[in-house]
Amino acid sequence: MLWPSTQRDFLLSLAFEGAYRFVFSEAILNEVEVNEEIKRLERGDRPEDAQAKAHHLATRMRTVFDDSIVRDWEGLEGSYGLPDPDDEHVLAAAVVAGAGSIVTDNLRDFPPEMVPAGIQIVSARDFAYETVSMSPDLGLAAVQAMSRRTGRHHPALAVSEILATLDKLYGMNDTTEIIRDLLHPTTAPG
């Protein structure tokens, strides 16, 4: 869920608005930082700029979600037999945190029979839909907050542009339709 960036921003904005409880470990955040730096290098950023921007992202997440950091998960790492041992830390952190879901588009590496009962493995698109359908007003607030944060380094984005990006890049059409309905409510004939 923490990759790619617009999807991450939307899902974290939902958490910030109170739509769900976001939890992560330092190991997860370290992966985000490394992947963000690699992405920026591939886009042509200078190494020191890529590293600084990636570090800023991780630091900002630690600050904004300081009560979401899961600790003491290490003892469970390696005890689930997941197909990719590098994903064990994600499941271990979810178990320790009492999470109800792991949001990932890497579904094949979290076979249901290897995941403890009570933890659902769900795609980012499905999670966004479930979350916004339960709290449409928080979905709208999340996108509005994203829009307000734009314009510092790049052109500002309207809510409609962010919704279009969520549709086009992440297939979140069902989710964005709920939000659009709040923006443009239809009136019943009467």
Q: Where do the language-model regions lie?
A:
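Acidic, metal-binding active-site segment of PIN/NYN-like and related structure-specific nucleases
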Residues: 87-121
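Short, well-structured N-terminal submotif of metal-dependent ribonuclease cores
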Residues: 1-26
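A generic structural signal for alpha->beta connector loops
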Residues: 19, 66-67, 118
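Short, basic, glycine/proline-bearing loop/turn elements
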Residues: 66-80
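Conserved nucleotide-binding/hydrolysis micro-motifs of P-loop NTPases
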Residues: 1-2, 28-29, 108-110
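Acidic, PIN/NYN-like endoribonuclease modules and their adjacent C-terminal/linker elements
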Residues: 108-190
